[in-house]
Amino acid sequence: VILLLVPLLIGRLVADIIKKEYCMKPGFWYLSGFLTMLALYQIICVPMTLKEYSFSKLVICYSIILGILSAIALWKYAGAILIWVKEKMQWINIFRGHSFFFYMALVLILGQIITLVCFMPDYAYCADDNTYITMANDTDETDMIIKVDSLTGHELSIDEVSLKYKLTSFITFMAYLARITGLHSLVIGKTILPVIIIGMAYYIQWMIGGLLFPDSRYKSEIFLFVISIVNLFMAFSNYTQTFRLMVCPWQGKAIMAVIVLPFLFYVGNKVFCEKFTIGEMILLMVTMFAAASASLMSLGIAPVMLLAIAFLNAIQKHRFMILLQAGICCVPAAIYLGMYVISILTTFGGW
């Protein structure tokens, strides 16, 4: 429920705020809902981490917020969602009317998911299992938010915890999922999340294909097929996007690389091509919060990508107000980047 129904419901609320045709699809609802969940968790988690609240309090606060939003969405859209399920979610209709390349892409994507879930759980990538998985499990078991040394098991003071853990939240988001579901963090990270993340990553690529070929679904399906083929051969280095997708999608850097940045590319090119609405600005700011939850790298990469897209569209359309609006959308990343810089200066500058 927490990873299937809740993102769909929250994303439906987001789509109602935006009120644009491109966001009125269940796949978009799920993506925007999942990113909104990450954004809300980031907003709540970082202050509670710095104030050294217990993990149980974080779980309660976050769950209440998700419960309220889900209840509102159910109250407003339950009837419409049920009608959509009856009309569109019949297996015979889902796979009807697509090209051969679409079916082949589905086979390849399913094969990648099965390979990762069934044959990769025993693979420990360097020391990242000791940090991501162990820290998530320690947070869940000790009820202290990232205050346990993953190598020694000793309790740390908040000043001893690395900034990249204090200012991001995806590790403890895995701990939250483990607490809510009753599953071990290892199962969440290496069995549950890969299915969700790989599915979302390829759906975004399909949307980008539609963006590149707006008049031909056939070409967008070929694009999806080509991407699924290329990914089979691109995990040769831990610096490739495919490596994050195919080997360790449960890491924050993977969320940034295969979910947040491609989604930002798609939405940025959508919103800057037409009249920019307040709802779309909110969506972009939510995406920035989600980026901040994943990795400190995203505090620089995500704003640069958004501003580059805005700059190109501003030149093409001679509407330079786009740059100001894009800059406002980058404020969430600027907040956490400012916190990072101040912490560094305070630590090493003697302030």
PLM regions and their residue ranges:
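Membrane-embedded, hydrophobic transmembrane alpha-helices
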Residues: 1-95, 322, 334-350
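Specific aromatic-rich, kink-prone transmembrane helix
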Residues: 6-11, 250-273
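Transmembrane-helix signature of membrane-embedded glycosylation machinery that interfaces
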Residues: 14, 18, 47, 205-215, ...
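Membrane-interfacial loop-to-transmembrane alpha-helix junctions, especially the N-terminal start
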Residues: 20-37, 101-102, 218-224, 277-284, ...
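Transmembrane signal-anchor helices characteristic of membrane glycosylation enzymes that use polyprenol
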Residues: 99-127, 228, 329-343
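Active-site lumenal/periplasmic loops and adjacent helix-entry segments of GT-C-fold
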Residues: 111-231, 242-250, 259
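Membrane-interface alpha helices of multi-pass inner-membrane proteins
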Residues: 280-296
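Perimembrane helix-loop-helix junctions
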Residues: 302-327
